[in-house]
Amino acid sequence: MSEGIYKSPKKSPYSCEIYDSEFEREFMEELEKDPKVKKWTKNHGIRIPYVNIGSKVAHYNPDFIVEYEDGTQELIEIKGKNNLTEIIKRKQKAAKEWCEKRNIKYRLITL
């Protein structure tokens, strides 16, 4: 994992954004270049409850919230193809349900 700080993003409300992987850093660059993207952040404070494998309620913090120029919003998770575990599937299911209730799109990007 390659963690780091993305400095001075123009479309984020913050002066820097923390990334947890090289995939996330590359995605931040794509968001900055995309003319359809109005704003984005990883520092959104969204915590989605889900039931983990031990049948206990846990909380999932999605990677990105993106707002587009047309007003739509999208919650985005970035994962490597080898990371699609049962836990990720449970988080994805909970995120989709959470987003549907709020008229937000959900997308899992696998690299």
Specify the residue positions occupied by each region the protein language model found.
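Electrostatic, structured charged patches in enzyme active sites and in nucleic-acid/phosphate-binding
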Residues: 1-111
